[in-house]
């Protein structure tokens, strides 16, 4: 039941056009990467309810104004995501987080990849994702 609630909702949009859906299409458009995930004994398990509670508490903490206040304003923040990641609800969830950070005066750099799903480092365009991340890292400058 819990597995269906967690993974089923995430995969729903990708099952409509796929009679052979395996339940994990939401992770990536790269079928080989999805298969690796399915074959890995440490992936795809249903977390304990307490673990989920901690995960959801962390999501709330990431947007809590008192916690955000403690993030150094000079800390560079890079956020990347696929536009088809169901976890972000059409980017609404991630934009809510970004707005909370920006309202605090934090500087964020964002990169959204069209049609990308949940695991952008395992997507069909992962080379671009990695290249953009490395370019951002190489352009950082820190004051000492």
Language model regions located:
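Alpha/beta-hydrolase-fold enzymes
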Residues: 1-42
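Active-site nucleophile elbow and catalytic-triad environment of alpha/beta-hydrolase enzymes
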Residues: 47-69
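Catalytic active-site module of serine/aspartate enzymes centered on a nucleophile-bearing elbow/loop
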Residues: 62, 102-144
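Short, conserved loop/helix-junction motifs that constitute active-site signature segments
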Residues: 68-73, 104
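Short beta-strand/loop motif that positions the catalytic acidic residue
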Residues: 79-81
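Conserved alpha/beta-hydrolase "acid-adjacent" motif
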Residues: 84-96
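A general structural detector for well-ordered alpha-helical segments in enzyme core domains, enriched
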Residues: 93-100, 129
């Amino acid at each position: 039941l819990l597995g269906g609630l967690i993974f089923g909702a995430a995969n729903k949009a990708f099952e409509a056009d796929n009679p052979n859906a395996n339940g994990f299409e939401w992770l990536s458009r790269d079928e080989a990467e999805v298969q690796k995930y399915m074959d890995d004994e440490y992936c795809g398990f249903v977390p304990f309810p307490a673990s989920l509670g901690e995960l959801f508490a962390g999501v709330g903490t990431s947007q809590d104004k008192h916690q955000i206040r403690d993030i150094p304003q000079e800390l560079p923040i890079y956020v990347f995501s696929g536009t088809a990641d169901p976890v972000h609800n059409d980017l609404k969830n991630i934009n809510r987080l970004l707005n909370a950070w920006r309202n605090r005066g934090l500087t964020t750099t964002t990169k959204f990849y069209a049609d990308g799903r949940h695991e952008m480092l395992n997507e069909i365009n992962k080379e671009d994702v990695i290249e953009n991340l490395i370019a951002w890292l190489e352009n950082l400058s820190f004051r000492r």
